Swiss-Prot record:
Pathway field: Porphyrin-containing compound metabolism; heme A biosynthesis; heme A from heme O: step 1/1
Name of protein: Heme A synthase
InterPro entries: COX15/CtaA_fam, HemeA_Synthase_type2
Organism encoding this protein: Bradyrhizobium sp. (strain BTAi1 / ATCC BAA-1182)
Broad class of the protein's primary localization: membrane
Function per UniProt: Catalyzes the conversion of heme O to heme A by two successive hydroxylations of the methyl group at C8. The first hydroxylation forms heme I, the second hydroxylation results in an unstable dihydroxymethyl group, which spontaneously dehydrates, resulting in the formyl group of heme A.
Length: 362
């Protein structure tokens, strides 16, 4: 017998997961602002419990500032910074970490409550445990990222930044998927190719998000600020794309190569989204599916326009954050469309309590 949440528990679970998803989206934006303001290395220690409180005295502020002075970023970029200026960057990083702790508590405490009530079990329970594990891993990945900028570099390693952001968005996507699975819907009778394309859109979106994080980590948006050409042409010279050795390093550390891949993946995402929007109409997939495809394509177009504007204007903070926020919307629409087209197993279907009672009586 499949165990399903009671009607009252189901409503509470959906509200809870919606709040967590919203907080994660906010966390991603605060993290983006922390990066854009060069604030991410202002706290040089990882104290998951005792680090909850900020400095509460002038002596504590001085100690925190002196600790910051020991890392390369201060010596090479911010030498001469005042304590007042340090406080500005400190608050961004502290707020980012505090929000992470808040998300952990907002997820964990209701989760334990639902477990105690027996409201989550089976596939739903396993999925929620997996999300919890990914959240715990994210905290460690965050410090792994910060640690990369404390010894030799003046910024965090771009690959670690991209890993940190990608994991946050993977958790967000898992919650969005779970929320959609908790909502009743009719099965979509569609050709298998539509499901394949929808999942392809999710995959390409994640690749694009990872590349966007690499662009941000490398500050690659501050160079090659022309469009549609890049480095003097629509396609850069191969010698410039593969200038570093070994060749694969260019995929992660060459400004030109990473920005070019980000552009090409954006074009791929648009073409795939446009094809999907056309194909669902041609297949007569139903109004809900067609609307989902059109919303996704519209979000991709808006995101592309914001990306081009951000590049041409040399990455103003407000526009860069808007670009990052719209990326979350694209991911949300892509995940929702993939779920909309995916068949549901019996264990994943939410059954009204009356139906459960009737089934047990029979």
């Amino acid at each position: 017998m499949t165990t399903v949440p009671r009607t009252t528990d189901l409503a509470a679970i959906r509200i809870w997961l919606t709040v967590v998803a919203g907080l994660i989206a906010l966390m991603v934006l605060v993290g983006g602002a922390t990066r854009l303001t060069e604030s991410g290395l202002s706290i040089v220690e990882w104290k998951p419990v005792t680090g909850t409180l900020p400095p509460l005295s002038e002596r504590a502020w001085t100690d925190a500032f002196e600790a910051y002075k020991t890392i390369p970023q201060y010596r090479q970029m911010n030498a001469g910074m005042t304590l007042h200026e340090f406080k500005t960057i400190f608050w961004w990083e502290w707020g980012h970490r505090l929000l992470g702790r808040v998300i952990g508590m907002v997820y964990l405490l209701p989760f334990l409550w639902f477990l105690w009530r027996g409201a989550v079990s089976g596939p739903l329970g396993r999925r929620l445990w997996l999300i919890f594990g990914l959240g715990a891993l994210q905290g460690a990945v965050g410090w792994w990222m910060v640690a990369s900028g404390l010894t030799e570099r003046t910024e965090v390693a771009p690959v670690r930044l991209a890993t940190h952001l990608s994991l946050a968005l993977l958790i967000f996507a898992a919650i969005v998927w779970t929320l959609r699975r908790l909502a009743p819907r009719a099965e979509a009778e569609v050709p298998a190719r539509l499901r394949l394309t929808a999942w392809g859109l999710v995959g390409v979106t994640f690749v694009q998000l990872y590349l966007g994080a690499l662009v941000a980590g490398l500050r690659a948006g501050l160079v090659y600020n022309t469009w549609p050409d890049i480095d003097g042409g629509l396609i850069p010279k191969a010698a410039n794309l593969w200038i570093q050795s070994p060749w694969w390093i260019n995929l992660f550390e060459n400004d030109l190569t990473v920005q070019f891949m980000h552009r090409m993946t954006a074009y791929t995402l648009f073409l795939l989204g446009a094809w999907h929007a056309f194909d669902v109409m041609r297949a007569g997939a139903g109004r809900t599916v067609v609307r989902g495809a059109h919303r996704l394509l519209a979000a991709i177009l808006v995101q592309a326009g914001l990306g081009i504007a951000t590049l041409l204007m040399v990455v103003p903070i407000s526009l860069a954050l808007l670009h990052q926020g719209t990326a979350i919307i694209v991911l949300t629409f892509a995940v929702l469309q993939a779920e909309r087209l995916s068949p549901r197993r019996v264990a994943a279907v939410v059954v009204p309590q009356a139906a459960v009672a009737a089934g047990q009586a029979g």
